Amino acid sequence: MLMKFKNFYPKVNKKAWIAPSADVIGNIDIGENSSVWFNCVLRADVNAIKIGKCTNIQDLSMIHTDVDNQTIIGNNVTIAHKVMLHGCTIEDNCLIGMSATILDNVVIGRGSIVGANSLVTSGKIFPPNSLIFGTSI
């Protein structure tokens, strides 16, 4: 469901797809050929969420922002099932594994992989083509 929050209504490219049970709220921009799958919550109430082209946000994922940090997801990104992203940047061509959590001010460089169940703590910056896995990274 697309929902307005304050003066912001989500902008979804006409070639993107949103599952009927997904909640897409507020200041969100979703690019061409991207998809948001079942039971996802994308909530841009305090800052913007930007999703590039050909990106997929899989079932049960949660994407939020911080007052000081937008959440930016590049082109050709896969966000696997049950991922949580909060106020971070995921550059182009990345894979974020199932149940990973990525917190505020993190930058995942283009072409990187974050392993399933990983916890990436605030402020970490990873160069392109990184392999990131584990907890308290």
Annotate each predicted stretch with a short phrase.
Residues 1-13, 45-61, 65-66, 70-75, ...:
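Glycine-rich hexapeptide-repeat left-handed beta-helix
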Residues 1-35, 39-41:
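Extended, small-residue-rich solenoid/repeat segments and analogous flexible loops
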